[in-house]
């Protein structure tokens, strides 16, 4: 075992941490799908899934078994290679986007000095999965849904980047750990409230969640860009959407609500509680808000979110300049 040097041991520990964290994220995404159906049932005065296992607790397992054994059908005129590659790209990019989130001071999949830029890169890569899925399916509804999704995602990613810039300017770092440590005495949500508001709205839009789910509007597009997908390919898109929700919720906590900081309880517990709160908010938004028209969604972004983020960035720069004098 002479090859097992301290450096190799450190690398193995880092890889093991990353694998554990990413597996937990996938499990959290699957659990959220069950929690969403139960909470929507509660909000809408119905039962929700309650047949498989005690209180429906094994519904996730039943769904996984069903997806695994469903026919993996590919449309006759589809581009088979791109059609197969699209859900993999979407799932992997959304999963890797979580890698830069620090759960505790020592637990994170990747501690990068350009953590925020890495997240923006992975979020941008997910757009290709949607475009590939819509184009390769050779279906007009699928292509229209993909065009909607790509335009919406690219638009709202601009607002995400601008809302991050105020936090980066205050913390003087792109590193997520440095940003969390800068909130030890005051959370960023207080000086950066408009940045938080814009990021929360844009995060819902980028995840294609209600009320910004026009790319998948069942009444208009018959389920949008993944209309032709079935089996595990559809499962990757399905779980990937919930992984995106977990990632956005964790980023809200990290960037604006102090990350793992909190009194009395261990850092991991604080991070988990804060993230779970915002995941429930995603579900509550779906249960309570109507779906606007697509042109209203785009107009809201460019006419309201963009000026709001620019004003927030201008005010942040003015405060930093004043304090430096």
Swiss-Prot record:
An annotated GO BP: aerobic respiration
Keywords of this entry: Cell inner membrane, Cell membrane, Membrane, NAD, Quinone, Translocase, Transmembrane, Transmembrane helix, Ubiquinone
Compartment(s): Cell inner membrane
InterPro entries in the cross-refs: NADH_UbQ_OxRdtase_su1/FPO, NADH_UbQ_OxRdtase_su1_CS
Gene Ontology molecular function: NADH dehydrogenase activity; oxidoreductase activity, acting on NAD(P)H, quinone or similar compound as acceptor; quinone binding
Topological type in the membrane: Multi-pass membrane protein
GO-annotated cellular components: plasma membrane
One Pfam family from the record: NADHdh
Catalyses which reaction(s): a quinone + NADH + 5 H(+)(in) = a quinol + NAD(+) + 4 H(+)(out)
Family: Belongs to the complex I subunit 1 family.
Record PANTHER family: NADH DEHYDROGENASE SUBUNIT 1, NADH-UBIQUINONE OXIDOREDUCTASE CHAIN 1
Subunit details: NDH-1 is composed of 13 different subunits. Subunits NuoA, H, J, K, L, M, N constitute the membrane sector of the complex.
Purpose of the protein: NDH-1 shuttles electrons from NADH, via FMN and iron-sulfur (Fe-S) centers, to quinones in the respiratory chain. The immediate electron acceptor for the enzyme in this species is believed to be ubiquinone. Couples the redox reaction to proton translocation (for every two electrons transferred, four hydrogen ions are translocated across the cytoplasmic membrane), and thus conserves the redox energy in a proton gradient. This subunit may bind ubiquinone.
Protein name (Swiss-Prot/TrEMBL): NADH-quinone oxidoreductase subunit H
Lineage: Bacteria, Pseudomonadati, Pseudomonadota, Gammaproteobacteria, Enterobacterales
